[in-house]
UniProtKB/Swiss-Prot annotation:
Pfam families: Intron_maturas2, MatK_N. This is Maturase K. InterPro entries: Domain_X, Maturase_MatK, Maturase_MatK_N. It comes from the Eukaryota. Keywords: Chloroplast, mRNA processing, Plastid, RNA-binding, tRNA processing. Coiled coil: none annotated. PANTHER family: MATURASE K. Usually encoded in the trnK tRNA gene intron. Probably assists in splicing its own and other chloroplast group II introns. The keyword Amino-acid biosynthesis does not apply. The keyword Ribosomal protein does not apply. One of its GO terms (biological process) is mRNA processing.
Length: 504
């Protein structure tokens, strides 16, 4: 953030909404390509002179402005004689700079709040790590949960129209439309994982900005309703979610519900309502009744249809009772199970046995999704039988063993939040045998002959159990007489592990 302030030198009170002139500043493209902010932006570089010329930027934007986007020819060439270079290449690079520029208004609002202009309540700024204490402390006290797949099929014009409430620079928004027309994907819909954007692979920053902005907008309804129902303005919400234009959308809600908008706010005053999002999924959990959750579902479906103008299938929102269903979230199967207990009550000469059921939060490791991930990575077949990994056969023996061992250690590390880890023994078996078959394939031998020659202990040391690592780490903290508690452990780095740990 300091680098942005030093290079941009914007007057936030007047100029932070006018970002279009920044596209003609060459250091923006240095920022976009991570050339480093400590060195001079005027450093001579042949690559830099050819790709980040101010003249090229001006010419390309002028050409895009004069182009007739209603006429498309399949024989159009990427080579433009006016520019003398590859137009698509320069469009890619300008879009990368645009991704940096369009983030500036959001960054400046955050900086102003952190500098003390607005007081930010720490409990309002939650990260992904706040999910773990929520599961531990709150989950067992809730009754119902809405399992939501965040809608993502949204037309790009809707995003541009919504973005103009944040960025009030019309020139920048027009340029964004030009870029989308340039790639002839104006009728494309945004998706979180697979996109038909021709620039999505090279411009991940811009693509992620659009998707995260869309998610931010879809979540804004929760902040708006909470503020309206409780009549308390959340200071931190003003930093991230400016709801100015939401008041103009109240008419849509009135038409949908055929009642006055204020009459339905009582539905959202539940103090036990919790909202959690992780990747493309979110949950809305409550201590309320099934009727309340159905009304929430009905409200969300209509909100997405009226505000984003997109069809949201009701099946994307599942209502589950925690006592009867397990929630597939964060790579775990989480549930609230009843732990029965009997209490003897003595009154004078009579004694009674009283049954008492205690709610307990429980997490298990889902074996089927894990095997499915191993199957996609070609460590086993669809039934879970280990197979060799031919693409790794050219590596050294130590590299092959290290790769297999690292995958298992990551999976074991990820699932330390579960008290029942029996499923991991199956995963360990698959990876160990797949590793042995890969080594045997490399040495043109059988698995039995290979292990007999080198010994099965060769693989054991690379598949260290997470519990053994935990013992080695904390053996000095706990006395051996008391033993080490085998409780649930949530590591804060689990979101950075490989795709297998995330079941993708």
């Amino acid at each position: 953030m300091k680098e942005f302030k030093r290079y941009l030198e914007l007057d936030r009170s007047q100029q932070h909404d006018f970002v279009y002139p920044l596209l003609f500043q060459e250091y923006i493209y240095v920022l976009a390509h991570d050339h480093g902010l400590n060195r001079s932006i005027l450093l001579e570089n042949a690559d830099y002179d050819n790709k980040f010329s101010l003249l090229i930027v001006k010419r390309l934007i002028t050409q895009m402005d004069q182009q007739n986007h209603l006429i498309f020819s399949p024989n159009d060439s990427n080579q433009n004689p006016f520019l003398g270079h590859n137009t698509n290449l320069y469009s890619q690079m300008i879009l990368e700079g645009f991704a940096v520029v369009v983030e500036i208004p959001f960054s400046l609002r955050l900086i102003s709040s952190l500098e003390g202009k607005e007081t930010v309540k720490s409990h309002k700024l939650r990260s992904i790590h706040s999910i773990f204490p929520f599961l531990e402390d709150k989950f067992s006290r809730l009754n119902y949960v809405l399992d939501i797949l965040i809608p993502h099929s949204i037309h790009l014009e809707i995003l541009v129209q919504t973005l103009r409430y944040w960025v009030k620079d019309a020139s920048s928004l027009h340029l964004l439309r030009f870029f989308l027309h340039e790639y002839r994907n104006w009728n494309t819909r945004i998706t979180p994982k697979e996109s038909s954007f021709s620039f999505s692979k090279r411009n991940q920053r811009f693509f992620l900005f659009l998707y995260n902005f869309h998610v931010c907008e879809s979540e804004s309804i929760f902040v708006f309703l909470r503020n309206q129902s409780s009549h308390l303005r959340s200071i931190s919400s003003g930093t991230f979610l400016e709801r100015i234009y939401f008041y103009g959308k109240i008419e849509h809600f009135v038409k949908v519900f055929t009642k006055d908008f204020q009459d339905i706010l009582w539905l959202f005053k539940d103090p036990f309502m919790h909202y959690v999002r992780y990747q493309g999924n979110s949950i809305l959990a409550s201590k309320g009744t099934s009727l309340l959750m159905n009304k929430w579902k009905y409200y969300l479906v209509n909100f997405w249809q009226c505000y984003f103008y997109m069809w949201c299938q009701p099946g994307r929102i599942q209502i589950n009772q925690l006592s009867n269903h397990s929630l597939d979230f964060l790579g775990y199967l989480s549930s609230v199970r009843l732990n029965p207990s009997m209490v003897r009550s003595q009154m004078l000469e009579n004694s009674f046995l009283i049954g008492n059921a205690i709610k307990k939060f429980d997490t298990i490791v889902p074996i089927i999704p894990l095997i499915g991930s191993l199957y996609k990575a070609k460590f086993c077949n669809v039934l879970g039988h280990p197979v060799s990994k031919p693409v790794w056969a050219d590596l050294s023996d130590s590299d092959i063993i290290d790769r297999f061992g690292r995958i298992y250690r990551n999976l074991s590390h990820y699932h330390t939040g579960s008290l029942k880890k029996t499923s991991l023994y199956r995963i360990k078996y698959i990876l160990r045998l797949s590793c042995a078959r890969t080594l045997a394939r490399k040495h043109r031998s059988t698995v039995r002959a290979f292990l007999k020659r080198l010994g099965s202990e060769l693989l054991e040391e690379f598949f260290t159990e997470e519990e053994q690592v935990f013992d080695l780490t904390f053996q000095e903290t706990y006395s051996t007489s008391q033993g080490l508690s085998r409780g649930r452990i949530w590591y804060l780095d689990i979101i950075c592990i490989n795709d297998l740990a995330n079941h993708e």
